[in-house]
């Protein structure tokens, strides 16, 4: 597959992290981050993008994981292979591996993860809080967020090596302060993102052959 003509289809948060790594001749398509909140819509949007891309490439790399089962049921075109990282969500992509993700959650289960991609697309809980204040008032917004964040203890910003992160640091600290959480930063890794682009597509990936369908079991198999 090394010489295959490839295309990446991913959500805005993942592509924000990947763009500095992409070769100039590698095609990509960005889908709306908001689709994550409607898995059935995510699935249909992904399938539509996959089908539309099939005539131009023979390998389609998805910048998505399981994502609330949004990837389950996707069908590879008759002429192209799908490559999907074997992760439940994109946090593992920013930390470098699914194992690193599990280690962070084991260290502190009440962790809310942030990365540049999430902040740049403007869809973090702090953004949602501000919108709720504008629409319903501070009292109701505070009540809603207390319910949502009652089990969280820290905000962990994943630094994947971008040059200017001042805006991201400020946003992450503000979010931690607003919701009464501890703020921490950890060093991320671009290893997984690099492997998505260039390979090798090893046991950390799901390869869906032409005309085959993605199953939940493929994500549950141990890497």
Residue locations for each model-derived region?
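N-terminal basic/disordered segments at the start of proteins
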Residues: 1-24
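Gly/Ser/Thr-rich loops at beta-strand to alpha-helix junctions
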Residues: 9-16, 35-36, 60-72, 88-89, ...
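A short beta-strand-loop structural module common to alpha/beta enzyme folds
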Residues: 26-41, 185-187
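Glycine-rich, highly charged phosphate/nucleotide-binding loops
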Residues: 39-52
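Extended, charge-rich low-complexity interaction segments
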Residues: 57-61, 65-66, 70-73, 113-129, ...
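Long, charge-dense
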Residues: 75-126
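Active-site rim beta-loop-alpha module in soluble metabolic enzymes
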Residues: 110-175
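C-terminal accessory domains and tails appended to enzymatic cores
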Residues: 184-223
């Amino acid at each position: 597959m090394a010489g295959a003509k490839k295309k990446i289809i991913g959500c805005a948060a993942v592509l924000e992290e990947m763009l500095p790594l992409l070769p100039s001749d590698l095609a990509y398509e960005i889908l709306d981050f908001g689709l994550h909140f409607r898995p059935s819509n995510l699935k249909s949007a992904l399938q539509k993008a996959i089908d539309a891309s099939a005539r131009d490439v023979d390998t389609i790399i998805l910048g998505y994981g399981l994502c609330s089962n949004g990837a389950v049921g996707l069908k590879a075109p008759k002429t192209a292979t799908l490559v999907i990282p074997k992760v439940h969500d994109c946090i593992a992509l920013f930390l470098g591996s699914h194992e690193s993700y599990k280690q962070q959650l084991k260290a502190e289960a009440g962790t809310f993860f942030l990365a540049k991609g999430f902040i740049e697309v403007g869809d973090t809980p702090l953004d949602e809080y501000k919108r709720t204040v504008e629409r319903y008032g501070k009292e109701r917004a505070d009540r809603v967020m207390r319910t949502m964040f009652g089990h969280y203890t820290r905000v962990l910003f994943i630094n994947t090596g971008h040059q200017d992160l001042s805006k991201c640091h400020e946003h992450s600290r503000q979010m931690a302060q607003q919701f009464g959480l501890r703020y921490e930063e950890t060093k991320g890794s671009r290893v997984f993102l690099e492997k998505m682009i260039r390979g090798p597509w090893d046991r950390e990936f799901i390869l869906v052959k032409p005309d085959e369908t993605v199953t939940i079991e493929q994500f549950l198999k141990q890497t």
